[in-house]
Amino acid sequence: MGPTISIGEALDRYDIDNARYAGSLQTDISAWLRLRNDDSQIIILHPDHRPPVKYEQDIFETESLVPAMNAARGVKDSYEIELIRKANIVSGLAHTAVLEKIGQMTNESDIAGLFLETCMTHGAPEQAYGIIAASGENGATLHYMKNNEDFGSRLSVCLDAGAEYECYASDVTRTFPISSTGEWPTTEARDIYLAVERMQEECIRMIKPGVRFRDVHIHASVVAVEELLKLGVFKEGNSVDEIMASGAVSVFFPHGLGHHVGLEVHDVSEQSVMAATDDMSPRMRARGFLMQPASMMSAALLEANMIVTVEPGIYFNRLALKNARTLPIARFIDFDVVERYYAIGGVRIEDDILVTTDGYENLTTAPKGDAALAIIRKSSVKNSRS
């Protein structure tokens, strides 16, 4: 378990007003009982936090603290924003380090190891979540975390990894070619990346106070349908509206557009932007991008100083597409065309976006798109000369 931290260390680490050792709890409560008003209660977070001591009266209130804390955590103060900004800076350095070395790497573990090492050397020894370094078709598995397969002839990597800094998370995903030339190895890989890039860029531009995040998610889905129609994945002759109404887009974009970021990578709030249930511990929840979209009326509105991810993706998951063949939505999908895209696995691009009073600020500094490809090319030339 390691050494017990001191009270001073606890005050500094958790930015709290008071801290006591657990051994003094019974004495402290007994002293409080002698002085309290008859209607006073001790407010605790969960029923299972009750001290293992019986009292004559029920002095513990367990209902009000969780929603109050959730509401407070949804909107960040300037101190929290700067810590999340710092976490993103460290993550950006780690993502850049991977891009600089990808041409020399041969296994997913090389990526995960370098990412973690870079974060640790820049003051962030903890990851906000388990690193996902998914090469080739592994990129179609949202929670792929084996990180141990050789690249072989695979086309690309979906790297979902973010540092934690002073208890605050970042959440960053980049997809890039496994290449020493900095070029997409196939037209199909490039086209899917550009489609997701368009999804993300248009959605980020929509972020501002008063916007219903569910509407931004719907826009991402519409763009995905438009792009997949252009590529022939959805059959010509079907309209965007028809495909959207059928739900067929969920085969390729099966998750929500984003979630809050804060003390947890999928942070709590008064009302989750994608209708996740906030009555369970964040550690016990599915990852944010797996939460089911809310109904139009229940989805939350964005407020200034919220920080949310914008993480669209397009995936070619063999199991999902095999199942789709048995469903009514199969009539919209050209499965012969789909065969050309399986090798891509999945493409996801994810940034952490601060909602400002009049728009947004992108806190994520990790290179993406053309900037990422340029780093791969430059590093390849440099490494060939050394």
Swiss-Prot record:
Pfam family, any one: Peptidase_M24
Free-text cofactor note: Binds 2 manganese ions per subunit.
Alphabetically ordered keywords of this record: Aminopeptidase, Hydrolase, Manganese, Metal-binding, Metalloprotease, Protease
Binding positions (Mn(2+) 1): 171, 311, 350
GO MF assignments: aminopeptidase activity; metal ion binding; metallopeptidase activity
InterPro entries in the cross-refs: Creatinase/aminopeptidase-like (IPR036005), Pept_M24 (IPR000994), Peptidase_M24B_aminopep-P_CS (IPR001131), X-Pro_dipept-like (IPR052433)
The organism's place on the tree of life at top rank: Eukaryota
Catalytic EC class: hydrolase
GO BP terms, alphabetized: proteolysis
Residues given in the record as Mn(2+) 2 binding sites: 160, 171, 350
Reaction it catalyzes: Release of any N-terminal amino acid, including proline, that is linked to proline, even from a dipeptide or tripeptide
EC number: 3.4.11.9
SUPFAM superfamilies, per database record: Creatinase/aminopeptidase
Needed co-factor(s): Mn(2+)
PANTHER family linked to this entry: XAA-PRO AMINOPEPTIDASE 3, XAA-PRO AMINOPEPTIDASE AN0832-RELATED
Family statement: Belongs to the peptidase M24B family.
Function: Catalyzes the removal of a penultimate prolyl residue from the N-termini of peptides.
Protein name: Probable Xaa-Pro aminopeptidase PMAA_074180
